[in-house]
Design a protein with these regions (language model features):
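Active-site-proximal beta-strand elements of phosphoester/diester hydrolases
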Residues: 190-195, 309-310, 348-352
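Proline-centered loop/turn at the N-terminus of a beta-strand
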Residues: 107, 190, 265-267, 283, ...
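Active-site glycine-centered loops adjacent to acidic/histidine catalytic or metal-binding residues
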Residues: 113, 270, 313, 353
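A glycine-centered loop/beta-turn motif at secondary-structure junctions
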Residues: 339-376
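Cysteine-nucleophile active-site neighborhood
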Residues: 234-308, 359-374
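RNA-binding accessory domains that recognize and position tRNA/RNA substrates
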Residues: 1-208, 214-219, 246, 357, ...
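Short amphipathic alpha-helix with an adjacent loop that forms part of the alpha/beta core around
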Residues: 222-232
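Catalytic beta-strand/loop cores that center a nucleophilic Ser/Cys/Thr
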Residues: 304-345
Length: 376
């Protein structure tokens, strides 16, 4: 392992050990409280531009496999772990985490106090940082960081969205029925999925809910979708998760506004949830350190039940959006809005991730609610 040198924008300078790729990399540091699922987290496109600090101390124990990828590659800038475990053991593993990171040119940082980093981010907020296995000089690292764009100024959607449309026909993973993905059931409705960085298991859950899926690029044309809806080629539109600040996505906001005006049935998750808010005229704001993990309690306002959810976002919709929508879900950690049903059109959205991956499946019913909305 090589030494790695870290400089954070609050002036903190740290030294640790590296695994994975050797590089000099700039990104935003966040922390994730999930106990499992490091592969799914690193391959989630929503983490583009970020270093993920894992609060679980032992990482790497179960290796990596091709089946648990949430996209075609790893998207996070890097990962902090208290202790990287080189010796992995799992019957599904195909390579080590170190090999995986090298293959995807991602930096891993170990032998560092992740509790210290987590408390720093909690108290001071998510911040920009630079890590390098090539440069140790604090002044030079500071200069690199100061000359790099902030995460709020980068449109990561252009990097993670598909370039061409495609059909998705895989269901969810059947662990008890042969360790394989289910074949798609006969669809009862069809949708277009706008890919802002969609996770594979979101698509799997939609398909499992008997919805036919065509994934389309982020530079979609609203008029085309409206025509397809009127011709009954699609029954609704899904707006996916994705990385970065939703306020920079001006073109996408304009197209979504046209879909809203046309009363197209829509469902949004995470970034899609935020874009629906902005397209209705209610701008999002940045949380201090975001919600990242698989243990976030959310109250279903209709049933009164509490669901433990998976979350991954740094931005949130404003409270005054209740002027045009009803709150369906609320976060019990900080009382932020987690779900909305709009008054003006057949549209609803959630901030958390009902597909989990990793995380609990207590919110999976939301995909069935989408089917009920779009069937005609």
């Amino acid at each position: 392992m090589k030494n790695v040198y870290i400089y954070l924008e609050n002036g903190t300078y740290l030294e640790a050990k590296s695994f994975g790729a050797n590089s000099t990399t700039v990104g935003e540091i966040v922390f994730n409280t999930s106990l499992t699922g490091y592969q799914e987290i690193m391959s989630d496109p929503s983490y583009a531009g970020q270093f993920v600090t894992f609060t679980t101390p032992e990482i790497g124990n179960v290796g990596v496999n091709d089946e648990d990828m949430e996209s075609t590659k790893a998207h996070a800038k890097g990962m902090f772990v208290r202790k990287y475990q080189k010796r992995y053991s799992n019957f599904r593993a195909e390579e080590s985490l170190d090999q995986f990171l090298v293959k995807h040119n991602i930096m891993g940082i170990t032998d560092i106090d992740t509790r210290y980093l987590t408390k720093m981010v909690r108290n001071e907020g998510a911040m920009m940082m630079v890590a390098s296995t090539e440069i140790s000089d604090k002044t030079e690292l500071k200069k690199i960081l100061e000359n790099s764009p902030r995460i709020e100024d980068v449109n990561y959607i252009e990097e993670v969205s598909t370039k061409t449309s495609y059909k998705h026909s895989s269901g969810t993973y059947a662990q008890k029925e042969g360790f394989k993905y289910n074949e798609a059931p006969t669809p009862e409705a069809n949708i277009a999925v706008v890919d802002f960085g969609v996770k594979r298991n979101i698509l799997n859950e939609i398909v499992e809910s008997k919805i036919g899926v065509e994934v389309i690029p982020n530079d979609f044309n609203a008029e085309d979708l409206i025509t397809q809806y009127n011709d009954k080629k699609i029954d609704g539109v899904f707006l996916s998760n994705g990385p970065g600040d939703p306020l920079v996505l001006k073109r996408e906001q304009e197209q979504i506004k046209k879909l809203i005006d046309a009363k197209i049935p829509m469902f949004g998750i995470c970034l899609g949830h935020q874009l629906l808010s902005i397209s209705h005229g209610y701008d999002t704001y940045k949380l201090k350190f975001g919600h990242h993990g698989g243990n976030h309690p959310v109250k279903n306002e209709k049933t009164g039940l509490v669901e433990i959810t998976a979350q991954n976002h740094n931005y949130n919709v404003p409270d005054n959006i209740t002027e045009i929508a009803s709150v369906t879900h609320s976060n019990l950690f900080d009382n932020t809005i987690e779900g909305l049903k709009y008054n003006d059109a057949p549209i609803f959205s959630v901030q958390h991730h009902p597909e989990s991956s990793p995380g609990p499946k207590e919110s999976r019913y939301i995909f069935n609610e989408f089917l009920s909305l779009i069937k005609r």
